[in-house]
Regions:
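Long, low-complexity intrinsically disordered regions
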Residues: 1-275, 279-281, 286-365
Length: 365
């Protein structure tokens, strides 16, 4: 399991802070979960040398990076080129998802007509858009209409000058309008149909999360059946067996460092795909600790790594001029780990709360 852990950390830029551009890092990771606005910034800070907020703000405002519905039907940050090229692979999952949720409420919904009308009302927040949809399509439920638009129409969120680039209720625009290109055409990988996009998505997944099983890739992407895609790519891949004799796929030449490779302490943000990227997550967190990583309302907590594995969770609270980082370790921490976490935690506080006049890292003994 340590070999899989070190391979994952290497590909996730967590063995050493990478000296690459934020755009290159986002491409390497495929997509950063962005249900909340702050986590992608922290996720890049923990992986990159000398990363600043301004760098990601610039990429978003220059339209090189977008925040959009992507993996698992949730908001992610990814490069504009990848969104254009890879989204087609996910559309069948989006369509199946909204039909399963809406059931008879979407039975006679004309999606093409709905999308065409919605496009004329963008950019807008969904709070602004839903009433307009309801007036235009009065026989359908307002929220069902909004959800259908979100799952059927390629949309991106419009960044602002907020600290973390997006307000809690951000406006959406059509990807074609925002990027001046249609998804599926002229992307970073060229013009791809849905099948080509699916093959590309599998390769990119393995580059960022391999070696991995088919079920791992399905859990990460939200796509129900990736076996045909893996079978088509099998001649180009290498395979291994894990401790349960399950078949793992990988790219030839992808980094697989030795198990004894040192791994520094690292802080991961809420919803980080390092935690969500596999069906079997033992390579990053012990099974007995998994229930403690999710809140009652299914929020994935921010975590920290010691020796490459999740060793606890963290919260950050700002009270007036004081910022406090509180760690909740799963077990007692050795002195070297505590010292390293205190130093790394202070750096995290400086990044997240640069104007705080007092900062503290609290680690229970």
């Amino acid at each position: 399991m340590r070999e899989l852990n070190r391979a994952l950390l290497a590909r996730q830029l967590l063995l050493d802070r990478a000296r690459i551009t934020p755009l290159a890092a986002i491409a390497q990771l495929v997509a950063l979960q962005a249900q909340l606005a702050r986590p992608p910034f922290v996720g890049l800070w923990t992986r990159l040398h000398a990363f600043t907020r301004a760098q990601l703000h610039q990429l978003l405002h220059d339209r090189h990076v977008v925040r959009a519905t992507f993996l698992r039907g949730t908001l992610h940050l990814l490069t504009a080129g990848d969104f254009l090229a890879l989204r087609a692979a996910l559309q069948p999952m989006f369509t199946a998802g909204f039909r399963a949720i809406l059931k008879d409420r979407a039975a006679d919904l004309d999606l093409a007509q709905l999308a065409a009308f919605a496009t004329t009302r963008l950019p807008a927040t969904f709070e602004q858009l839903r009433p307009q949809l309801a007036r235009q399509f009065p026989r359908h439920d307002e929220r069902a209409l909004g959800y259908a638009v979100r799952m059927h129409l390629p949309l991106v969120q419009v960044p602002t000058d907020e600290s973390w680039a997006f307000p809690s209720s951000a406006a959406f625009d059509s990807a074609e309008s925002w990027l001046a290109r249609k998804p599926g055409t002229s992307g970073a990988l060229g013009d791809l149909d849905a099948l080509d996009a699916l093959d590309a998505l599998v390769r990119r997944y393995l580059a960022a999360f391999g070696p991995a099983t088919i079920k791992d890739a399905q859990r990460w992407s939200g796509i129900a059946d990736l076996a045909p895609a893996f079978d088509a790519l099998r001649p180009e891949l290498v395979t291994f067996r894990d401790d349960k004799r399950r078949e793992l796929f990988d790219l030839p030449g992808a980094p697989r460092p030795p198990a004894e490779t040192p791994a520094p302490v690292r802080f991961l943000p809420d919803f980080d795909n390092l935690i969500l990227g596999h069906d079997d997550r033992r390579r990053i967190v012990a099974d007995e600790h998994r229930p403690g990583l999710t809140t009652k309302n299914l929020q994935v907590k921010a975590t920290f790594l010691v020796d490459g594995f999740v060793a606890g969770t963290w919260t950050l609270v700002r009270a007036r001029h004081t910022a406090t980082l509180t760690l909740a370790p799963f077990a007692a921490l050795a002195r070297p780990a505590r010292t390293a976490l205190e130093a790394e935690g202070d750096a995290l506080l400086t990044f997240v709360e640069p104007d705080a006049t007092s900062r503290a890292v609290s680690i229970p003994r």
